[in-house]
UniProtKB/Swiss-Prot annotation:
Cofactor: Zn(2+)
Protein name: Threonine--tRNA ligase
Cellular compartments annotated: Cytoplasm
UniProt subunit comment: Homodimer.
Cofactor: how bound: Binds 1 zinc ion per subunit.
CDD domains for this protein: TGS_ThrRS, ThrRS_anticodon, ThrRS_core
GO MF, one annotated term: tRNA binding
SMART domains reported in the protein's UniProt record: tRNA_SAD (SM00863)
Annotated binding of Zn(2+), by residue: 351, 402, 532
Keyword Protein transport attached: no
Gene for this chain: thrS
InterPro entries reported in the protein's UniProt record: aa-tRNA-synt_IIb (IPR002314), aa-tRNA-synth_II (IPR006195), aa-tRNA-synth_II/BPL/LPL (IPR045864), Anticodon-bd (IPR004154), Anticodon-bd_dom_sf (IPR036621), Beta-grasp_dom_sf (IPR012675), TGS (IPR004095), TGS-like (IPR012676)
UniProt lineage: Bacteria, Pseudomonadati, Chlorobiota, Chlorobiia, Chlorobiales
Length: 659
């Protein structure tokens, strides 16, 4: 940039690595990206300035932090897929004139567009639309944003575009928005807040995956539409990798493996979304619970147990009742012997119950911090279409802890909670963990409880702790809970998928609502601060993710059956049973395969069941009080004395070895 510009004509932009560069006022995101590097300029999709996503053409007028958004980030993928939905709509309009367009968002797995057309779309149509999308990409159409009044936009979509769905959005959803935006690419225009990538040429590879029925705005009484799904990428290589990952994910599906490995079941007689744990699954679940309980005990947590239901007034006080009312089971209504009506809820959250335990007796500043913990089951009435094995259920168990502390203890306690969460993920083999600092949406503060001063303090506390722990976090505006900001931990599994798991949250709101106090050194009452903390989150969901991450090949310490004893023939059954008993006496979970099958068949079946170790016993092993050791997926490990083999197993178990 020119060095002759006066200081008043320059702005300072801070890059993610901390570098500060001077640019002329009005510099665009594209120009900033180009000044950093040619490759970055090619990959750039948008910018993030002042915490908000903007088009590359956005003119920057003031100092601030800037980030160049590429497809590598979650925000970049969402933007890329949203832009791709616009390209799909343009292709459909060119191929099937008269089609009207509803909503076309990005979703976690790509994008879709709801369309209204007399034409019934087929698989062959999808291939034709794909080809037209790539042809539009080759046109290199510039994608341009136009801002105009809501009234002008209504007129535009009534007369020039003749799209009743966009008119309805403008007259209803955006009725209080004076200025709206339209994006143009060639002859196609769409109502959208953006941002979008700068040219249709950014689309390099696309696959339209399916068609389903939908209703306008999700209302079955409204017009039926066709929903066309797709996914797109900046290269054909990434597209192929994506579908390869999908095939691998099918093999790892926890619902499939959960049935094959006899871990859990869901019975329609019991109810949708209510999993039942079979013996092997219960062992896996109990091992995870014991692991965390033991670690928490070492770190000063106190166990509590609370009921599965609570008086509705409890959740009105906490604010959970109005906040979760759409996803709760209906209240249970009872009339007592005096004719008084009472209502109870299946517990949607453990927090209010723990607050009652805290306030059950006077607390002193010397008592704090108090760390209460519970594996507490909670209930949410999820829609049937959203249920998914263990990942999305109606009854689930949270590893819920609430830490009550003084303000001067807060940052250290947050750090300790972060350390525990990191320890859990490391032990379970999640090596790649991202952290998101989930803050309020500054544009919509009305949906959060508590005053501004409290929120500013809570967000600063979390930032201080995250910095102290040297977390490489990113900011998630609008991702906070209604009663406090939080740190969310996002893990990447064995096939590259991201999952949001553990949470650490600061809460100044609930102590006020429940009038929680402690007596300070000055003899006066003070409010404690509450930290909500759950490394697993939902235990059911965590196990579902764990099953898929390990593809059912659990580390020895978690495996429901750790050793299968395989006698070569019936002649060695007695010795096999003595081996089994010694394993059981040593605290090792073992079974014996006494079927009259050849040992090769027994080995194959144990491999299918994903049992970590197999001890094969025959005449030679019996004579030497030894076992022939086989490792799942690794094969023969040689013959060794039984006691040595037991010590090997015990070491794997005690060290919680992953592989």
């Amino acid at each position: 940039m020119s060095e002759t510009l006066a200081d008043s004509e320059l702005i300072k932009l801070t890059l993610p690595n901390g570098d500060v560069r001077a640019y002329p006022k009005g510099v665009t995101g594209s120009e900033v990206a180009a000044s950093i590097g040619k490759r970055l300029a090619e990959d750039a999709l948008a910018i993030k300035f002042g915490g908000k996503l903007k088009d590359l053409a956005f003119p920057i007028q003031q100092d601030g932090a800037i980030e160049i958004v590429t497809f590598d980030s979650d925000e970049g993928k969402a933007l890329y897929w949203h832009s791709s939905s616009h390209l799909m709509a343009q292709a459909i309009e060119e191929l099937f004139p008269g089609t009207k367009f509803g909503a076309g968002p990005s979703i976690e797995t790509g994008f879709y567009y709801d369309v209204a057309s007399e034409h019934r779309f087929s698989e062959a149509d999808l291939r034709e639309i794909e080809a037209r999308m790539l042809e539009i990409s080759n046109r290199d159409l510039q994608i341009q944003r136009e801002e105009l009044s809501r009234e002008a936009a209504i007129e535009y979509f009534k007369t020039r575009r003749e799209d009743p769905f966009k008119v309805e959005i403008l007259e209803d959803t955006l009725k209080d928005t004076p200025v709206v935006s339209i994006y143009h690419q060639g002859e196609f225009s769409d109502l959208c807040s953006g941002p979008h990538f700068s040219s249709t040429s950014k689309l390099k590879a696309v696959r339209l995956t399916s068609i389903s029925g939908s209703f306008w705005r999700g209302d079955a009484s409204r017009q039926q539409m066709q929903r066309i799904y797709g996914v797109s990428f900046p290269s054909e290589k990434l597209l192929k990798k994506h579908f390869s990952q999908i095939e691998e994910a099918k093999k790892r599906d926890h619902r499939k493996l959960g049935s094959e490995l006899e871990l859990f079941m869901i019975s329609p007689e019991v109810g949708s979304g209510l999993p039942m744990w079979l013996p092997k699954g219960a062992i896996l679940r109990n091992e995870l619970e014991s692991f965390l309980k033991d670690e928490q005990r070492r770190r000063g947590y106190l166990p509590v147990v609370t009921p599965h239901i609570g008086n509705i007034e409890l959740y009105k006080t906490s604010g959970h009742y109005p906040y979760y009312s759409d996803s709760q089971f209906p209240p249970l209504t009872f009339t007592d012997e005096l004719g008084k009506e009472e209502q109870y809820l299946l517990k949607p959250m453990n927090c209010p119950h723990h607050h009652q335990i805290y306030s059950s007796k006077p607390r002193s500043y010397r008592d704090l911090p108090i760390r209460l913990t519970e594996f507490g089951t909670v209930y949410r009435y999820e829609q049937s279409g959203e249920l998914n094995g263990l990942i999305r259920v109606r009854g689930f168990t949270q590893d819920d802890s609430h830490i009550y502390c003084r303000q001067d203890q807060l940052v250290d306690e947050i750090c300790k909670a972060i350390d525990l969460t990191q320890f859990v993920f490391k032990t379970l083999g999640f090596a790649e963990v991202q952290t998101r600092l989930s803050l309020r949406d500054p544009e919509n503060t009305s949906k959060y409880s508590g005053n501004n001063e409290v929120w500013v303090q809570a967000e600063q506390d979390l930032k201080d702790a995250a910095d102290k722990m040297q977390l490489n976090y990113f900011i998630g505006l609008g991702e906070a809970s209604f009663y406090g900001p939080k740190i969310d931990f996002i893990v990447r599994d064995a096939i590259g998928r991201k999952w949001q798991l553990g949470t650490v949250q600061v809460d100044y709101v609930m102590p006020e609502r429940f009038d929680l106090t402690y007596v300070g050194s000055d003899g006066q009452k003070h409010r404690p601060v509450v930290i909500h903390r759950a490394p697993f989150g939902s235990l059911e969901r965590f196990i579902g993710i764990l099953i898929e991450n390990f593809a059912g090949n659990f580390p020895v310490w978690l495996s429901p059956v750790q050793v299968m004893v395989l006698p070569i023939t019936d002649d060695f059954r007695d010795y096999a049973h003595s081996v089994l008993q010694k394993l059981l006496d040593a605290g090792i979970r073992a079974e014996i395969d006494e079927r009259g099958e050849k040992v090769g068949k027994k080995i194959r079946d144990a491999e299918i069941k994903k049992i970590p170790y197999m001890f094969v016993v025959g005449e030679k092993e019996m004579a030497a009080a030894s076992v022939a050791v086989r490792r799942h997926k690794e094969g023969d490990k040689g013959t060794m004395p039984l006691q040595e083999a037991i010590r090997l197993l015990q070491t794997d178990i005690s060290t919680k070895k992953i592989s």
